[in-house]
Amino acid sequence: MKLAIFDFDGTITKSDSFRGFIIFYHGYRRFILGVLATLPSLVLYWLNLISNNNMKQRVITHFFKGESANKFRDLAEKYSNNKIGNIIRDEAIDKINWHKNNRDEVVIVSASIDMWLKPWCDKNSIKLISTEIEIKENKI
């Protein structure tokens, strides 16, 4: 048995699931306003002055800090069940299935948040290593 490791966003998907989730959660208008509000962090990232991790943490904080964890989980699962399939590359699924048919262990490693990736991975019998969002007192 071999280990087959895949990145999720941009490898298995045609587009970024994080951006898609923000739009699904808040709507396109709030997404655009949020991008404008976090533009300084995005510019710092594009100039390699802050890490991807740092930039993503700032964006997550902007869009989700203080949100109900129950609402977040619920919408993440709905996003996974209703939207993720639309952005999956056919050739990526073919390659994943090839590995599974050869009894290889398939693992997705992603910086994206587990709450929308895990339902899709579970449905497709794929192991997942991803970002877990911090929850305190049922708040993001």
Residues covered by each model-derived region:
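Short, basic/glycine-rich phosphate-binding loops at helix/coil junctions
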Residues: 66-79, 135-140
